Amino acid sequence: WEALRNQYAKSSDYTPATAATQASKDLVTKLMGGGPNPYGTQYPQPVGTDGKLAAGARPLWNSDWSDAMEQQALRTELNLSVSGGGKANQYFFSAGYLNDKGIALESGYQRFNLRSNVTSEMTSWLKGSINLSFAHSMQNYPVSSDSKTSNVITAGRTMPGFYPIYEMNTDGSYKLDDNGDRIYDFGSYRPSGSMANWNLPATLPLDKSERMKDEFSGRTYLEATI
């Protein structure tokens, strides 16, 4: 409201009082375009000419975009190893599993790995060793860039709560589709600079970016004493 009032006050067409009045009249339209009034139809001007909320005005929703685009980053790691042998032969085997959920929605990393090492003194003059390892990893990561519309963390912290994640009725209830499910609000009514036609909580589960990688390595040696 204050920014809008100051914008009007710069014009010679307005006095400080009329600039404040015009800002109160235009606030909802400037922020929401043709979208729903966050304070309901009974408060077409939720902010008065003094810059304060009108008496009784309460937001019908306050969307938490960060919460909608983040998840609990649980980490599970399991490791198992076996080793043994005698004077002439020694062995070591290990296996591991890692599941690291990322903080951003649809992000995470999984890895399975195996490793083995066998050393043997085959004769009094010949000994050798073999070392093998294998790792299979899967990484999911949301599309990201410096743009506030593509960076999950930045977008969640930038988007104001008065823009709803789901389409809302004028009484603050959710609009539902024929199956009784909530309908994502892509904000076609949002003004320029407010990420119109955008809703990452809706598109991230469909816009998957995955990377799978297999790594194998082997080393061996023989040593003969002549």
Regions found by a protein language model. Give the residues of each.
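Surface-exposed loop/interface segments of Gram-negative outer-membrane beta-barrel transport/assembly proteins
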Residues: W1-W61, G102-S107, N113-S217
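Outer-membrane beta-barrel pore proteins
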Residues: T49-G108, T119-T123
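Outer-membrane beta-barrel transmembrane strands
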Residues: Q71-N89, G96-L98, L200-I226
